[in-house]
Structures are given as C-alpha cells and as structure tokens.
C-alpha cells in the first residue's frame, strides 16, 4: 500500500457491465453475484483461504475517495488481500474505509487478519451493499500493479486487462469501499449457481 495518493488517467468504472464480447461471460457470471463472493468461491473450490497482504493507513486512489463521501482525498484505513482457491490466487481485494468510522461502525476490521471480510459483512443485518460498478483494468492501473506485485510477477503490458467490480457497503453513517480484481486463475473455476 502506498502512502501517496495514486492517480490514473480517468476512471474506468461504470455502472453497467461491459459488453459480454469485451468482459466475457465467465467473468460476468462471477461479477454479478449479489451474495458473498467468499461464499461463492468456497462453493466452487475444495479449499479456500485469505492471504493478508497488508492493512494500514494509506491515501485512496483518485477515483475512490468520493465513493466514501469524503470532500477530498484523506487518509483511509486500507486492507489488501488475495483470495485463494485450491492454492491458486483468484481475486485481489482492496478495501478502504475512513479511519474515524472503524471504531463505531466497522469494529471487527482491525482484528480481521486472514478471516474473510465478506463473512463479516454479510452476517451483519445492519450492513447494506450499494450498486456494483464494473471495469476492465489495464496494466497501468495501480490495483493491477499491486495485484501483480503480490503474485510476484511483472506487471502486464497496458493491453492486458483484468475484470473488476466494486461496491460501497454502508453501516450506520459510514461507508466502506470494496474492490475485487478477478485474476486469471479464476478462469478454471466455474461460478456456482446464483447464490
């Protein structure tokens, strides 16, 4: 995680799925599930685990801070993990929340460690999920660079694009932005029926 605000030429995020010819039907089936992605990944694999890459204070990306309702870029608590199915990293997940709201509305976050965030969010009836936004992120996007660094590889060229989705969770008066980048290894796992 970087302590400096990251910029990217323009926001790739859209409220509708990209066309199937671009996004791919397989990826779309993973992206549109309304329930916990963690539960769906567990159902699609024989083993599942979370690898915590880092958690700490960081400035949000340029297209993120407004999602939290912040008037300007301000330090957030950021959490980055890999979701791993059958020992293959299949999702890079990036979460940000304003630090002041952690104690009041997201008290579990600081001690979550390698436990899945999705389980905590979907088990709490006071948490509401907002609409999804979707993107195809190319190799220049900071989250793709971080995902490839976590995998120990070199960032792909600007033409390599990874499907991603994000949504805002609300509890009380605070917001949490969760972004999930689908990694190539997810291609071998069939999404379970809509859960």
UniProtKB/Swiss-Prot annotation:
UniProt-annotated binding residues for substrate: 79, 117, 180
Gene3D superfamilies: Chorismate lyase-like
Pathway named in the protein's UniProt entry: Cofactor biosynthesis; ubiquinone biosynthesis
GO terms for cellular component: cytosol
Record key words, sorted: Cytoplasm, Lyase, Pyruvate, Ubiquinone biosynthesis
The keyword Lyase appears for this protein: yes
GO MF terms, alphabetically ordered: chorismate lyase activity
One GO term of the biological process aspect: ubiquinone biosynthetic process
EC class of the enzyme, as a word: lyase
Cellular localisation: Cytoplasm
Catalytic activities: chorismate = 4-hydroxybenzoate + pyruvate
EC numbers for this chain: 4.1.3.40
Function field: Removes the pyruvyl group from chorismate, with concomitant aromatization of the ring, to provide 4-hydroxybenzoate (4HB) for the ubiquinone pathway.
Family: Belongs to the UbiC family.
Protein name (database record): Probable chorismate pyruvate-lyase
Organism: Ralstonia nicotianae (strain ATCC BAA-1114 / GMI1000)
UniProt gene name: ubiC
């Amino acid at each position: 995680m970087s302590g400096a605000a990251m910029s990217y030429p323009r926001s790739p995020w859209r409220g509708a799925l990209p066309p199937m010819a671009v996004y791919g039907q397989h990826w779309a089936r993973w992206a549109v599930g309304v329930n916990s992605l963690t539960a769906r990944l567990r159902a699609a694999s024989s083993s599942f685990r979370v690898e915590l890459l880092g958690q700490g204070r960081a400035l949000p990306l340029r297209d993120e801070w407004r999602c939290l309702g912040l008037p300007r870029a301000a330090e957030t608590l950021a959490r980055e993990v890999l979701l791993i199915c059958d020992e293959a990293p299949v999702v890079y997940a990036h979460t940000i929340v304003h630090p002041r709201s952690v104690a009041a509305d997201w008290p579990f976050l600081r001690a979550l460690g390698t436990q899945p965030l999705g389980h905590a969010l979907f088990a709490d009836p006071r948490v509401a999920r907002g609409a999804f936004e979707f993107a195809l992120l190319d190799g220049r996007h900071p989250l793709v660079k971080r995902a490839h660094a976590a995998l120990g590889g070199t960032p792909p060229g600007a033409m390599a694009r990874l499907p991603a989705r994000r949504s805002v969770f609300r509890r009380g008066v605070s917001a949490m932005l969760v972004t999930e980048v689908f990694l190539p290894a997810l291609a071998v796992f069939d999404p379970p029926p809509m859960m």
